Amino acid sequence: MKKDIIKAMNIDPKYLEKNNIFIYQDYYYQKKINPQYIDWTTEEATLFKFRQNPGYTNSLGVAKINFPNKHAVYLHDTPKKSLFNEEIRFFSSGCVRVQNIDDLINWLLSDSANWNESLLHEILDNSSTKTLRLDSKIPIKIGYLTAWVENGQIQFRDDIYKKDAT
């Protein structure tokens, strides 16, 4: 994501402002940095921490689902719902976009006490960060396929992660 932001800033110096993204010195998010004092063509630009306010225009959409893994991958929504209509959909910066994420969240939390769908919409409409924890662990398995059969027809896709040889 940092690379995407840095590239965008080199094209449009107002990118951060337009997208409600703020720069901080470190992960504690205490000291805000003015973007006009950063040389976006240097390695220094990669050292800062970026934060976008929650809400429907956030690049991760309205929800992010963290799960333990060594690659820092997470599941997330998107404000660009039309991307789900595309045949080739590897637009994310390495994480997994989830279509109808509210349905997934409701399913994940369905066994939790005092949980209901109206509570989810109340949380999402609030545009603030809210951490929810599952009562029990649910395994997540992610497969990477470049060939499969669909309706009797073999399908091939580009090996964007260069994993077919491994």
Which residues make up each language-model segment?
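Well-ordered beta-sheet/strand-loop patches within structured domains
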Residues: 1-166
